[in-house]
Swiss-Prot record:
Entry note: cofactor: Binds 1 FMN per subunit.
Gene name, Swiss-Prot/TrEMBL: pyrD
Name this polypeptide is given: Dihydroorotate dehydrogenase (quinone)
Lineage: Bacteria, Pseudomonadati, Pseudomonadota, Gammaproteobacteria, Alteromonadales
Residues at the catalytic site: 174 (nucleophile)
SUPFAM superfamilies: FMN-linked oxidoreductases (SSF51395)
Alphabetized UniProt keyword annotations: Cell membrane, Flavoprotein, FMN, Membrane, Oxidoreductase, Pyrimidine biosynthesis
Family statement: Belongs to the dihydroorotate dehydrogenase family. Type 2 subfamily.
Binding site for substrate: 65, 110-114, 171, 176, 245-246
EC numbers on record: 1.3.5.2
Subcellular compartments: Cell membrane
InterPro entries: Aldolase_TIM, DHO_dehydrogenase, Dihydroorotate_DH_1_2, Dihydroorotate_DH_2, Dihydroorotate_DH_cat, Dihydroorotate_DH_CS
Associated pathway: Pyrimidine metabolism; UMP biosynthesis via de novo pathway; orotate from (S)-dihydroorotate (quinone route): step 1/1
Entry annotated with the keyword Hydrolase: no
Organism for this UniProt entry: Idiomarina loihiensis (strain ATCC BAA-735 / DSM 15497 / L2-TR)
Source domain of life: Bacteria
Length: 334
């Protein structure tokens, strides 16, 4: 069914199409229209970070920023769903146009800039959902928050989402918020992770429930930077790491829109992200699980991430290009 409507969808503006589909999914998931995307997916349970996942294929953050469509995405058979990135206060994001399809490259460039309705609205939507599966909530800082005060934004979000998340992702790797990637390095990283770890342990006592903290990193790090970051993750007892976010690289692109600013996702990111996963797993010595994401568009590309050492995988751009059938295909062949 998706292959029938995809040409029509791809003729429209990417962001308008995105908004249209989210509107349909959020409003129609309880009606017969949901039969267009509902599917049975094989059970391939895996336990990671103390959490039982029905299968290892998840939805990456960024598609459902405000947690409006959790129920619909669960009907597609995802093993877990990650919503956000969410910030303490609602913000409009960057100027439009800010989302570009590179169909010749099976890729997307985005410079959205953490557009979202704010953490309170996301929590309201999560509470209204009937979803009982594994939910990750991805948190970030507001654009106008100075870099030296970023910790306050992450702590504010963590405090509000903690009771409703199965894990919380700390997004310090989007290329579309000025200064954000600086938090991946040195004392900035250690200070942030240390503060969040302290808050996590306090919240775990308060709610009598331990919610893992996961850090999402960029693919554009040098090898020694990945190794230093891995040591910081171990030192601050993080529970997981997502590798990777979008890339600033434009190597080998064919599309006329290749020069647009923003983060690149999709097939061109495939090998770059897998290489980071391999290096991370080697440095971490499997003491911290890795969630692999970046260019997964087939059984083979998912298996490459798992072979590199990832315990779970996430899809986004491949899902946009191929639809829900990608989930079932990957899970059934793992």
């Amino acid at each position: 069914m998706y292959n029938l409507i995809k040409p029509l969808l791809f003729r429209q503006d990417p962001e308008k199409t995105h908004e249209l589909m989210l509107g349909i999914l959020s409003k129609w998931h309880r009606t017969p229209l949901s039969l267009f995307w509902k599917q049975n997916v094989a059970s391939k349970p895996v336990r990671v970070m103390g959490i039982d996942f029905p299968n290892p294929v998840g939805l990456a953050a960024g598609l459902d920023k405000n947690a409006e469509c959790i129920d619909a995405f669960s009907q597609m058979g995802f093993g877990f769903i990650e919503v956000g990135t969410v910030t303490p206060v609602a913000q409009p994001g960057n100027d439009k146009p800010r989302l570009f399809r590179l169909t010749e490259d099976e890729a997307i460039i985005n410079r959205m800039g953490f557009n979202n309705d704010g953490v309170d609205e996301l929590v309201k939507n999560v509470k209204a959902s009937s979803y009982k599966g594994v939910l990750g909530i991805n948190i970030g800082k507001n654009k106008n928050t100075p870099e030296e005060q970023a910790i306050d934004d992450y702590l504010a979000c963590l405090n509000k989402v903690y009771p409703y998340a199965d894990y919380v992702t700390i997004n310090i790797s989007s290329p579309n918020t000025p200064g954000l990637r600086n938090l991946q390095h040195g004392s900035s990283l250690d200070g942030l992770l240390s503060s969040l770890k302290t808050a996590q342990l306090t919240l775990a006592k308060e709610y009598e429930r331990y919610v893992p903290l996961v850090v999402k990193i960029a693919p554009d790090l040098e090898d020694h930077e990945v190794e230093v970051m891995a040591q910081s993750l171990l030192k601050n007892e993080m529970d997981g790491v997502i590798a990777t976010n979008t890339t600033l690289s434009r190597d080998g692109l064919q599309s006329s829109q290749a020069g647009e600013a923003g983060g690149l996702s999709g097939k061109p990111l495939q090998d770059k992200s897998t290489r980071v996963i391999e290096l991370l797993c080697k440095t971490l010595q499997r003491k911290i699980p890795v969630i692999g994401v970046g260019g997964i568009d087939s059984v083979e590309s998912a298996e490459a991430k798992l072979k590199a050492g990832a315990s779970l995988v996430q899809v986004y751009t491949g899902f946009i290009y191929q639809g829900p059938g990608l989930i079932r295909s990957i899970v059934s062949h793992l």
